[in-house]
């Protein structure tokens, strides 16, 4: 092989390696870096918490009939799932509070009690801003980490007393009060600040749970639902062809979301 051919071969191999490496680096960046998307619609409501100040994004409804807290995946608020869900729910008549799990985890250490305090504060701020009654119905929804944290809050006796149910999109079987680098890379949360949803499930009473299951999602878990107490209604909502992000909260997902809320309204909390 001539020198010129060797040079061409080396350069060709280098280009191939770069082409293969680029999507891997992009994927790692996508996992590790928080999303910096800022909604053009939401108003930020300040929260004063024992763990430090924070804020919830408020999406107004013309004639609000209840409150929906939308909790993010571990990457933070994005136009991928959270923003479409918040906008859809506001149009449907819910005063929405957006909860950025990544920002919360990046700015403090916390446990279940502090997480419950924070969710309660978000509900109270949205209730006040929307002018809703103290006994208005409340729902939590979340994607991945957000769904897991919603379960942790619901398992506490100190949660908001008017919680109707949880709309959980793609939770895993374990989570953490926080977000570690290992979590972002897909490792199963372990250690003293982690928790299993199945361990919390027996404490969940008086609400309903709808879990959305993407057909192509390798990360979610449904086994934890079997640990719920007798009388805590739950249902699985299959989303055909959907990966972990539920297909970006498209029309099919949002339609199922609406039907899940109606199911909760039609279903007694204790059977």
Please place each PLM-identified region on the residue numbering.
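Alpha/beta-hydrolase active-site loop
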Residues: 109-132
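The feature captures the conserved acid-bearing segment of alpha/beta-hydrolase catalytic domains
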Residues: 176-230
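Short, surface-exposed "cap/lid" segments of acyl-processing enzymes
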Residues: 61-91, 98-101
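Primarily recognizes the serine-hydrolase "nucleophile elbow" in alpha/beta-hydrolase
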Residues: 129-131, 135-195
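C-terminal catalytic histidine-bearing segment of alpha/beta-hydrolase fold enzymes
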Residues: 232-271
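N-terminal cap/lid segment of alpha/beta-hydrolase-fold proteins
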Residues: 26-63
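N-terminal Sec-pathway targeting helices
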Residues: 2-24
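Acidic beta-to-alpha connecting loop that harbors the catalytic carboxylate
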Residues: 74, 214-218, 240-243
């Amino acid at each position: 092989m001539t020198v010129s051919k060797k040079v061409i071969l080396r350069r060709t191999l280098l280009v191939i390696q770069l082409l293969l490496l680029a999507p891997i680096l992009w994927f790692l960046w996508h996992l590790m870096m928080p999303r910096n998307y800022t909604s053009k619609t939401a108003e930020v409501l300040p929260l004063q918490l024992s763990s430090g100040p924070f804020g919830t994004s408020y999406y107004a409804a013309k004639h609000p009939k209840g409150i929906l807290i939308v909790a993010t995946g571990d990457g933070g608020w994005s136009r991928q799932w959270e923003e479409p869900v918040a906008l859809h729910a506001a149009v449907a008549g819910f005063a929405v509070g957006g909860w950025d799990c990544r920002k919360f985890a990046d700015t403090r250490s916390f446990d279940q009690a502090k997480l419950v305090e924070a969710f309660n504060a978000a509900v109270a701020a949205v209730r006040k801003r929307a002018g809703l009654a103290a006994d208005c119905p409340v729902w939590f929804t979340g994607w991945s980490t957000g769904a897991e944290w919603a379960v942790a809050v619901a398992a506490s006796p100190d949660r908001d007393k008017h919680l109707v149910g949880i709309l959980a999109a793609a939770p895993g079987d374990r989570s953490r009060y926080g977000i570690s680098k290992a979590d972002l890379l897909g490792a199963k949360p372990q250690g003293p600040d982690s928790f299993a949803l199945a361990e919390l499930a027996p404490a969940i009473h008086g609400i309903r749970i709808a879990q959305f299951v993407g057909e192509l999602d390798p990360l979610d878990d449904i086994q934890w639902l079997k640990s719920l107490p007798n009388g805590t209604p739950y249902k699985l909502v299959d989303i055909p062809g959907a990966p972990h992000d539920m297909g970006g909260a498209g029309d099919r997902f949002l339609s199922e979301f609406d039907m899940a809320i109606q199911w909760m309204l039609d279903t007694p909390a204790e059977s």
